[in-house]
Amino acid sequence: MRRYITIVAAAALAMGCVNENISIPSPDTTPTTVVIPEGATAGEVIIKFAPEMEAILDQTMTRSGGEATRSGIPSTDEVLDILGAYSFERVFPIDSANEARTREAGLHLWYIVRFDEGEDLQQAFERLSKLGEVDKLQCNRPIARAYNPNANPMFVSCAEADSHAATRATAWPFNDPEIYRQWCYINDGTAPFATERAGVLAGADAGCAEAWDMCTGDEEIIVAVMDEAVMWSHPDLKDNIWVNEGEELYAGKDADGNGYIDDRYGYNFVRDTGITSWTSNGSTGHGTHVAGTIAAVNDNGIGVAGIAGGGKGKRGVKIMTIQLFDGMNSCSLAMEARAMKYAADNGAVILQCSWGYHSSKSNMIMGYIPGPATEEEWAALYPLEKEALDYFINYAGSPNGVIEGGLAIFASGNEYAAQSSFPAAYSKCISVAAIAADYTPASYSNYGSEVLLCAPGGDLEYYGTPGMSDNIYDEHGVLNQQGAIYSTLVIDGVAGYGYYEGTSMACPHVSGIAALGLAYAKQQHRHFTSEEFRELMYTSARDIDDYFVGEKLYYMRHESAGATPIKMNLADYRGKMGRLADAGALLKAIEGSGRDMRLPNICLAPNTLTSLNLADYITEEAANAEVANSEIATATIEAGVLTISAKSEGQTSLSVTTKSGTKHYATITVRAGADNGWL
């Protein structure tokens, strides 16, 4: 339930200013609607200040060393005095390497205020909303899982998994012994869980068969898994885990200056520490399961396969763990926003998000609390979340890399609802619905016009036998959970494998396909904007509306005796499940799309040098490099690596000639204070 509080702002207040050259905007005298969602944290308000306040705020933060008790703005501080504020700090810590774009995006103007929890939050919002210097207000609150934390997945130990061998008719491309359970990658129509009522159709999968002949991954593509912690030491994941070189666990210092201590494998935004945890009471292994679908190590002779996990002589994509849930606890909205920015600033180009608010059309009788109904309502309720997402979408990647901007991929939700949840439904995100192994919508999946893509997510309510356990023995004499998604898992700190279902499982299929596509684009020397790549994922996906005919029968709470059958009218889902993401079709579409990669311009300081691998930009072997003015800089090529050595300030041109005579050009700028970045 949401509360809407209408406030008529007071007349302009007489306000002093610490700097006579900085004017404070007049307060808005039009009626203002302040929205405080249920579950808002007492004693905390998140404020975005007007741009005119930048100098005052910077001065306050400089004096305080990063955390203060007051803003330095007299009118704001009068209210903070009344509220008993004891903490005033930037939402986003300073990362010197990315501070310029942080300011360009306006994220440096977001602050979190902590005050006496006994103060009425509504009155705090009323007081602050009247201030002309306040641009936006938002509550803080813990984020919620969109999946059931009490689910009990069937668990298979590593030892048991490695004892299995595939005998299925399909010729699998990798030697991972459990790959035969992963119908979601290559579905040949022979899965053992098919029944007369609930069938299996060949091709209802992620399209990996064709894709894996073209590409298996690339270690320079980084996927940020925003979820429970990923078990970075899992035997089937450890070789594909992102490592922040230079940082060490338990060192107690920020070695790379990015504002985060000990973040070697990612960061725990629940406990604000670089030590991520998958053993806390209430941990479900959800993040580890998601990560395995994207990048479990392929062809390593153990466990399962990942869509972009490498193999055939190639390394897989890298998984960055962004911990939003830790046991029974979750991070706040402020920390969630930090997490999104952290992912962009540390090299991730895909946000994998199997969580979100409940759909606005979810049924309250079933225990769901409906979330935002429109993009405008979501943006008004959670403006910080939207701006952090926009930052990732706009600033992740590189204009000189395979993608400029990032892809934010979200599960549509599991509330059986006729609208996607937010943030998935945001028009710049990719909302993912779930299908069963016969192309039909999964019984639980949210759907609607906001959904862009769908992927296998399992459907136990469809394939399960009413009144019986989902755990059955397959043709190998091994326990199998009917029609669910099999991946890496950790339970009670023990690495293994297991089954889950949900749009949470469909989502990483799309993230894995996106990662594989970017790996192939790099292989083909293609460059895309995030918007272009998002559109290509959609147009290359398969239209499956023709399968939505007649009715589908499923049993909610089907393991209980006397479960009631429920009928789905499949025609209701036409045009509302998106298109079926297809790895093979995407890779083929990448050929000839986007634009050629080209040599980036370079800016560096005098008496420094930098280098890059020419194979990332030029398809032919380079023969030599020439700099027009050798007094400014020189260039050499050795083993395909171009090295630029700066001498004195100035600007000059660089040409790289291939063995066939083709020339590639770039500009070299040498100036004091440059950070040696490719532009």
Regions found by a protein language model. Give the residues of each.
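Inhibitory N-terminal propeptides of secreted protease zymogens
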Residues: P25-C158
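Extracellular S/T/G-rich loop segment that most often corresponds to the catalytic His/Ser-adjacent loop
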Residues: S421-A519
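Bacterial Sec-dependent N-terminal signal peptides
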Residues: L13-G39, A674-L679
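A short beta-strand micro-motif common to beta-rich folds, especially ectodomain repeats
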Residues: S648-G661, A666-I668
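Protease zymogen maturation seam
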Residues: E99-I112, E126-I222, V230-D236, N240, ...
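Subtilisin-like serine protease catalytic core
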Residues: D205-L333, N346, G356-S360, I403-E404, ...
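C-terminal subdomain of the subtilisin-like protease fold in secreted/lumenal serine endopeptidases
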Residues: A348-W355, N363, G405, A519-L609, ...
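Substrate-binding/access-modulating region of protease and related hydrolase catalytic domains
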Residues: V18-I22, D213, G217-E219, E228, ...
